[in-house]
């Protein structure tokens, strides 16, 4: 007996070992497949922001930068750091994708935590990685279905929506097109209606529907059916769907099941859609049914897809995933859902715009316009109420669906606490106020200037109660922030004084170029005025383009730059646009000297501004830190677009109205012809802002810009002192190579100096990216100032 038991134990051990080896082999093979897929099968990749999907009920909503990769099988996302060994954070199998559409995550009723950007959504069902994809393709039924949790009849099959925020309109369009194309090639089933907004826990932000299962309020874009053959004389619907009579015993509602021609409904439908039914619905009967992925399609060819579930009633009947009780009975309100298949995109003008060039269209503030073509990032073709058509700057308008507080003069968006205080103190008016985004993400703050008991600015967090009402004092609650502001215009209600006026009209932002597709400017269009300064490249004068737009005109010295190369680059640089970058309008290249025409910044260079206002700035750590953050935002944009500045310093940043700081002259150093400027031995080279790899090998990168940014921070917190004092360049080079860094400025907090030291890490790979610096400094600002 003992021997038998021992032998059995030995055999069992062998079986376990064999099983373990097979499992290990499968795991290894899966890793190899993943590696192969990433190396050879990547269709598109890039960095974007991902919104948490909150599959678990009580997990918090957050947004994180991720590296996304689209292959022919999956849409995956990874940690953004450690490029060579990124850790995968999640993936969506494209067999499970049901829709890819633009989304609205911010604005009225949206997520106040949402970062700026261009969101889109990917609606999908969860599909397992290996065997289930085979089942999907071959229609093998059984068990729990196709990797989606098999459910007993009457229970829900989980469906999810991934929200991703792209960096530009163009990038979003490219991602949507790419994902749809791969899904089309794979014959994945589609959803026909969807919600463009978010479910807030109480209602949809888009249509205000009060049920999470409310029918989708917008028609999804049409996807071509890759397996349709127009030559056979039948319609796509005939090829791709099998209708089920509303009078049959199978269903009480009208719907179609979209399916793959190689699969059969079999026991899936005949047996009440059991475990082998379509999408793996059910769990008991119908084991031999098809597992071909299907999407519910009402006979109006409209369906929706969101995080709401696909349902089965107690009889095994399929119900519409997004409608309580299934497809609506004719005559009910839901049955009259409007078909928005021809969706009209409306925008509202935030600023006035005067059309000067032919083909452009003037904008009237607060007027609505219909978008005809938004394929270009910075100039859209629109139609006004009178039917006039032309191009307008896209940053002057906001989609009506996204329009929130931007329509109000008192809303200043991302303005910091320090800039708000500076702005409100300028007018010195009692009751002057602004509403801004709080440093605490997702909240808003009211900043109010009062003279009681003396002139100062008070800040009040706008809070929400359990009923989602807004208040400054719990005794006075309102449904919306505008209602709250209106109330406190007439009643102080616990504030230091009544709200009376906002400071002034918002400054009109610059456009990407002076007109649609215009980058070459004729010198006769410019009226040159006073000299603003001079530098390495020549004299800078103030100018006016066609007598209406203030500009700065850089008159380049002949022989100082590679002109032909720069002119080509200028075509691209006019399309770079960010609130913290000085806008390049265009060039005058048809005569010599060349003119470079840029946005005019009334307070001039940051270096001179710091030195002029040292007495008022040196003790205002919050305002100095805000300047650093603004520069980091502009540099984050350049970093994302693979632009290297090469000469980042306080002298190459400019200051405009409302203490706005912008980065100037980005990329210009690349076109300098002076050899001394690009060698470590010359006096003109910005050695005191250069890292070791630039001093030793002239090796520029985004990380060399990070080093220079650390020096710029030091300049800001010393109010324009020269780095390394009177040390000669050779002495500076020696110190940098030995790892000796600049000392902490007296007015600088330790937390801020710690960020500077990170920028001065000896190896470029050890320095943080600008987007990381931006987040770190924002956190420091919140800790030190709010």
Curated annotation (Swiss-Prot):
Q: Record-annotated residues binding Zn(2+)?
A: 195, 206-207, 217
Q: Which residues carry this modification: Phosphotyrosine?
A: 677
Quote the EC number.
2.7.10.2
The record's section on PROSITE patterns has: PH_DOMAIN, PROTEIN_KINASE_ATP, PROTEIN_KINASE_DOM, PROTEIN_KINASE_TYR, SH2, SH3, ZF_BTK
A Pfam family (short name) is PH
- Which part of the chain is the PH domain? 41-184
Q: Which UniProt keywords apply?
A: ATP-binding, Kinase, Metal-binding, Nucleotide-binding, Phosphoprotein, Proto-oncogene, SH2 domain, SH3 domain, Transferase, Tyrosine-protein kinase, Zinc, Zinc-finger
Tissues expressing the protein: Ring canals in the egg chambers and imaginal disks of third-instar larvae.
Q: What class of enzyme is it?
A: transferase
The UniProt note on the cofactor reads as follows: Binds 1 zinc ion per subunit.
Keyword Glycoprotein assigned: no
Instruction: List cofactor names only.
Output: Zn(2+)
Q: Where is the composition biased (Gly residues)?
A: 264-290
What SUPFAM superfamilies does the record tag this protein with? PH domain-like, Protein kinase-like (PK-like), SH2 domain, SH3-domain
A GO biological process of this protein is: determination of adult lifespan
* Binding annotation for ATP: 532-540, 554
Which cellular components does GO assign to this protein? apical part of cell; cell periphery; cytoplasm; germline ring canal; plasma membrane
Question: Gene deleted: what happens?
Answer: Flies exhibit shortened copulatory duration (due to incomplete fusion of the left and right halves of the apodeme that holds the penis during copulation) and reduced adult-stage life span.
Annotated zinc fingers (Btk-type), start-end: 187-223
Q: Where is the composition biased (Polar residues)?
A: 241-260, 291-301
Q: Report what the protein is called.
A: Tyrosine-protein kinase Btk
Which species is this UniProt entry from?
Drosophila melanogaster (Fruit fly)
